[in-house]
Amino acid sequence: AAGWADLDLDDAGALVRCTYEANLQYTGGSTNLCPLSTLPFLHQTTSGAVPTVDQIMDRVVVSHDWMGDVFEQLLRTQATQDILRLFNGVTAIVIGAQVRPSFYYALTGAIYLDADNFWLTAAQRDVINEAPDFRSDFDRDLMYSGVWRYTQNNQNIFLAFPATSRISRDLTYLLAEAGWLLYHELAHASDYMPPAARPTLNSSLSAWGNISPRYEAAQLPSDLMAASFPLQSAPLGGLAQVKFFGATADATQRAYTPNDVAGFFSSDRATDEYN
C-alpha cells in the first residue's frame, strides 16, 4: 500500500489519490485528474523560492516507509540549492518498489522514482522488484550498444553492489546513485512546466490541463531547442525508435556496424543517444 513520509496537506489522502491510483484518466466522461487546487505545483506553495526540505517532503509518496526516510536524509545532507529549487516544478515525488524505469508524468505533474536508487541496506533492497527495465531488450537485434558514464576526477562514480554480497551503501554514495536521476527527471518537469509559465497557472485545471496547451502548440523549451538546433541524422532517429520506443529493427538497421553509428553521431548535434 502507498504511504507517505511526511504530510501537512489539508487532505493527506489526496496526495496518494492524485498521483498513485491506477485508474487516473484524462479523457472522456471519466476524467478524474486532480485540479491544482487539490494538488498544486510546489512552485505555487513557495512562490518560486527555494523549497525547504519539509515542503518537499510534504509531497512525497512512498510504497515503503524507509524510502521516505532515506530520501529525506538525502535531501537534508546531500542536496544542493539548485536541486531543491528544481522541485518547484513538480506536484509530487513518488518512490516505489515497483517503479521501473523512473519517469516524469505530465498528467499528474509528478516524478516517479525507482527505489533501487535509494536503498542503503540489504533488507531495504530485498523489497524492490528485480524485473529489468522493459526497454532493456529493445536493442537485441542491433549490432552496437550506446555507452555512457558519469565521472568525478575522471573516475566512474558508480560502484558495483551485487545482490548476493548483502553489503550496505553509505548515505553519501546516494548523491552519485540518485543525484543524476533527480536532475534528469526534474529537468523533464521544468521542460513541461517552466518557471516562466508557473505564475499564470489555472488552479481549476489539472497539471495536464495546464501543460497540454503548451505541449500541443510545441511551446516547451525542448521544442524551442529542437527548432533552433535540429538534429540532422535520420538513421539515428530511426534507431532511437527501436532502442527507446520498441519499434522493430529493419534489415538496414540490423546491419549497421558500431562505426556506422559513430559516424552518424559524430556529425550531428546531440550530446548523447538519450537525454
Residue ranges and their predicted role:
Residues V242-N275:
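Pan-zinc metallopeptidase signature
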Residues A1, S190, G209, P213, ...:
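Generic low-polarity alpha-helical segments
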Residues V61-V70, R169-E177, L181, D268-E273:
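Soluble non-cytosolic domains of exported or imported proteins
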Residues G48, T52, S168-R169, D260:
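Hydrophobic alpha-helical segments with strong N-terminal bias
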Residues D8, G13, F103-Y105, H184, ...:
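Broad hydrophobic/π-residue packing in well-ordered secondary structure
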Residues A1-F103, A197, N202, N275:
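N-terminal low-structure segments adjacent to metalloprotease catalytic domains
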Residues A1-L9, C18, L120, S136, ...:
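Hydrophobic transmembrane signal anchors and adjacent membrane-proximal interface regions, especially
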